[in-house]
């Protein structure tokens, strides 16, 4: 049965407007962006199939272009719609953080970093430079490594921070193929960078790790040296 023939309260767009986004499943949200399905599938059926195929909505959004385009029912137009939905979220978070409306909220910081780092096929290391009011001055990926490690130069991180006249910073990196549990090397880097920042009156306020399916904040979890 086509979605237009469903009861009004069950149609994704009408359901969204009447009850709010919290009442929609991932498949229903995705179906709104897909707009149409195929000859044999409704937009919701197609959305469910994609999420099942990739394992989660997050995995779908992080998948390489060629992998998504190889899926039945997904052409360039639908893929562009999926990318646009992700970019809308990124730009919203970016605007919030640049006006100081989000950096005091741990979840928004994690969401912002996650939208930028999840999907990177290799391990990368990024720095968020902030002013005293926690407005975002700059976000940049400074180092790119391999599939399971990334070399970081602490002196380069400090030079980068000073070049943006920042007083506070957050560091972040990803685990492309594992969960967000910090490794011994992650903990050592965090400690050494915190010590180096303290010497030049820079405040390192968090280290965020983006795993395959979750994001971890050192500060939120009171992990050393923030605990």
Curated annotation (Swiss-Prot):
Q: Which SUPFAM superfamilies match?
A: JAB1/MPN domain (SSF102712), RuvA domain 2-like (SSF47781)
Which InterPro entries does the record cross-reference, listed alphabetically? MPN, RadC_JAB, RuvA_2-like, UPF0758, UPF0758_N
Name the UniProt key words of this record, in alphabetical order. Hydrolase, Metal-binding, Metalloprotease, Protease, Zinc
Q: Where, in this chain's numbering, is Zn(2+) bound?
A: 173, 175, 186
Q: Name one GO molecular function term.
A: metallopeptidase activity
Example GO BP: proteolysis
Among its keywords, does the record have Zinc?
yes
Q: Where is the MPN domain?
A: 102-224
Motif residue range(s): JAMM motif: 173-186
> Could you say which protein family the record assigns here?
Belongs to the UPF0758 family.
NCBIfam families in the record? PRK00024.1 (NF000642), radc (TIGR00608)
- Name the record gives this protein: UPF0758 protein Psyc_1834
Species whose genome carries this gene: Psychrobacter arcticus (strain DSM 17307 / VKM B-2377 / 273-4)
């Amino acid at each position: 049965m086509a979605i237009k023939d469903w009861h009004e309260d069950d149609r994704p767009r009408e359901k969204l407007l009447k009850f709010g986004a919290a009442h929609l499943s991932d498949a229903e949200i995705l179906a709104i962006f897909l707009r149409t399905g195929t000859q044999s599938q409704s937009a919701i059926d197609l959305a469910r199939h994609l999420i099942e195929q990739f394992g989660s909505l997050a995995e779908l959004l992080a998948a390489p272009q060629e992998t998504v385009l190889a899926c039945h029912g997904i052409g360039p137009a639908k893929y562009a719609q999926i990318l646009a939905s992700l970019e809308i979220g990124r730009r919203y978070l970016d605007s919030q953080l640049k006006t100081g409306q989000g950096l005091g909220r741990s979840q928004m910081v994690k969401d912002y970093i996650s939208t930028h780092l999840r999907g990177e096929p290799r391990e990368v290391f990024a720095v968020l430079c902030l002013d005293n009011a926690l407005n975002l001055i700059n976000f940049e990926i400074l180092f790119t490594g391999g599939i399971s490690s990334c070399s970081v130069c602490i002196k380069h991180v400090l030079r980068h921070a000073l070049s943006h006249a920042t007083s506070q910073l957050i560091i972040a990196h990803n685990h492309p193929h594992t969960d967000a549990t910090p490794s011994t090397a992650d903990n050592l880097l965090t400690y050494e960078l915190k010590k180096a920042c303290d010497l030049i009156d820079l405040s390192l306020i968090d280290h965020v790790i983006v795993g395959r399916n979750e994001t971890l904040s050192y500060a939120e979890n009171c992990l050393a040296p923030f605990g």
